[in-house]
Amino acid sequence: MKAIVQGKFGPPENVLKVQEIDGPGIGDGDVLVQVRAASVHVGDYYMIAGLPYVMRPLFSALRTKNRVPGSDIAGTVEAVGKDVTAFQPGDEVFGSYKGAFAEQAAFPEGSLALKPDNLTFQEASAMGVSALTALQALRDRGKVRAGEKVLITGASGGVGTFAVQIAKASGAEVTGVCSTRNVEMVQSIGADRVIDYTQEDFTAGEARYDLILDN
């Protein structure tokens, strides 16, 4: 199969290359997915670049030779291990694990979910790390409730765009912080108010919030 592989740390344009490699094997609890879309988030970049430098020993321990980077995918189930009960060949799935930047990826059963019919593969592939980070921050850690005032910095980024929508769906009054070029986009995904940080110091205002997601 074709895959993007990485042999050393560095800028992605210098260290990533497309190669033909053997397809991944699957264990009894694994699912083999034909990858239809894979997204890139900031964690992928840091793992590829080996940044910050102090983390390189850990990254090296996690990395095999000619590592296939990437974590978030959406695709179609090709095969399942004998202990897998939640999926069968032909199912459309999405999830987050490792080895995403390839034509096929082997994911543990628990790292996948069925793709909603109303999402494209491209849309579903973007939900893994970023959407779960936003959900865990707001629902699990922040305990966001209807009627609360929520401030989200970095509201136009990967985590921020999901956070705005999750907070709004929870019934919160949402204020997003972003740059000028993204004001309309953040408004379009549900923010009740948008602060352009290039024009206003949002830390100096008198507004008070029940929950702040400093993203």
Residue ranges of predicted features:
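Mid-domain Rossmann-like dinucleotide-binding core that forms the NAD(H)/NADP(H) cofactor-binding site
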Residues: 125-199
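Short Gly/aromatic-enriched secondary-structure transition segments
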Residues: 45-55
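A short acidic, Gly/Pro-enriched loop at the edge of an enzyme's catalytic core
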Residues: 204-211
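Glycine-rich beta-strand-centered segment in the early N-terminal region that forms part
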Residues: 22-39, 53-99
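Residues that mark the start of a beta-strand
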Residues: 2, 30-32, 149
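NAD(P)H dinucleotide-binding glycine-rich loop of Rossmann-like/cofactor-binding domains
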Residues: 46, 62-74, 79, 92-154, ...
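N-terminal Rossmann-like NAD(P) cofactor-binding module of classical short-chain dehydrogenase/reductase
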Residues: 94, 212-213
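Redox-cofactor binding/interface segments in oxidoreductases and associated redox assembly factors
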Residues: 196, 213-215
